[in-house]
Amino acid sequence: MANCEFSPVSGDKPCCRLSRRAQLCLGVSILVLILVVVLAVVVPRWRQQWSGPGTTKRFPETVLARCVKYTEIHPEMRHVDCQSVWDAFKGAFISKHPCNITEEDYQPLMKLGTQTVPCNKILLWSRIKDLAHQFTQVQRDMFTLEDTLLGYLADDLTWCGEFNTSKINYQSCPDWRKDCSNNPVSVFWKTVSRRFAEAACDVVHVMLNGSRSKIFDKNSTFGSVEVHNLQPEKVQTLEAWVIHGGREDSRDLCQDPTIKELESIISKRNIQFSCKNIYRPDKFLQCVKNPEDSSCTSEI
């Protein structure tokens, strides 16, 4: 310790005592050491304590594997370089603050994943993901967002990085409600949802959950992003399929106030609107598989 010294003590029992100056230096040194330990141990842990779950395990490997599988199944996408796709995906969030992600960060990935979906073949959905995906598994020429390359890559995954490092954060990621909305996952889905809606043309279908209190929720991705990015010069009609929760529910949910709100929004954008009750979703899927079945002529 610089400028600190030991002082002899007079008396019958000689010993070594620290001078007041030395004691002060020692105390300051101990405090500095404690502070260093706190900064090294506590601060990194504090940075990781977001409210949401951490990045999905084996995230890089999962994205790459999904890309390879998708491009093998879809011949029109075989030109895609999956390593470049992963590099662009990673570049959108690595080393960036996980609450300060922008749509621009994802633009390189968007360009690599550009994909043309035929007119009349887009199916949007809100709060009824499983049935929408069951439908497109049967009706193979219809596409939800998750049936496109970019949607397929990220479906059900979580990811974020650590600010100013090249690390992926596997401990926790921001929750869009509790922490911030400009997080890597939320911004990704907002970006791809907007592009998906902008590309839609002719008749666009949307599947809505009739068992929810708000059948159309203007705060959902469909209500806040996709509805407002349908292009009137390309889209003729938005047709809503309202899925009923049980056979005993015979109400006309197309008259629900939230559906009327949706109709008003769409009409003001110079797009036609139609609505259909799907009273029996199980029968609905059966009739998609076998449209010639005589029972499919009745209302489902």
From Swiss-Prot:
Gene Ontology MF, one? NAD+ nucleosidase activity, cyclic ADP-ribose generating
Record GO cellular component, one term: plasma membrane
What membrane topology does the annotation report for this chain? Single-pass type II membrane protein
The catalysed reaction is: 2'-phospho-cyclic ADP-ribose + nicotinate = nicotinate-adenine dinucleotide phosphate; NAD(+) = cyclic ADP-beta-D-ribose + nicotinamide + H(+); NAD(+) + H2O = ADP-D-ribose + nicotinamide + H(+); cyclic ADP-beta-D-ribose + H2O = ADP-D-ribose
Broad class of the protein's primary localization: other
Activity regulation description:
ATP inhibits the cADPR hydrolyzing activity.
Which residue ranges does the entry give as Extracellular-facing topology?
43-300
What is the activity's pH dependence per the UniProt entry? Optimum pH for NAADP(+) production is 5.0 from either substrate, activity is much higher at pH 5.0 than 7.4.
The residue ranges crossing the membrane are 22-42
Where in or outside the cell it occurs: the entry states: Cell surface; Membrane
**What is one GO biological process annotated to this record?**
positive regulation of cytosolic calcium ion concentration
Outcome following mutation: C160A: Loss of cADPR hydrolase and ADP-ribosyl cyclase activity
- Carbohydrate attachment residues: N100, N164, N209, N219
Taxonomy, superkingdom: Eukaryota
Cite the active-site annotation. C119, C201
Give, from the UniProt record, the effect of changing C119K: Loss of cADPR hydrolase activity
Work out whether the entry's keyword set contains Zinc-finger: no
Task: Kindly give the InterPro entries that the UniProt entry links to this protein.
Answer: ADP-ribosyl_cyclase (IPR003193)
**What's the subunit arrangement here?**
Homodimer.
Q: What else is known?
A: A cell surface antigen recognized in lymophocytes by multiple mAbs.
- Function, in words: Synthesizes cyclic ADP-ribose (cADPR), a second messenger for glucose-induced insulin secretion. Synthesizes the Ca(2+) mobilizer nicotinate-adenine dinucleotide phosphate, NAADP(+), from 2'-phospho-cADPR and nicotinic acid, as well as from NADP(+) and nicotinic acid. At both pH 5.0 and pH 7.4 preferentially transforms 2'-phospho-cADPR into NAADP(+), while preferentially cleaving NADP(+) to cADPR and ADPRP rather than into NADDP(+). Has cADPR hydrolase activity.
What name is this protein filed under?
A: ADP-ribosyl cyclase/cyclic ADP-ribose hydrolase 1
Lineage of origin: Eukaryota, Metazoa, Chordata, Craniata, Vertebrata
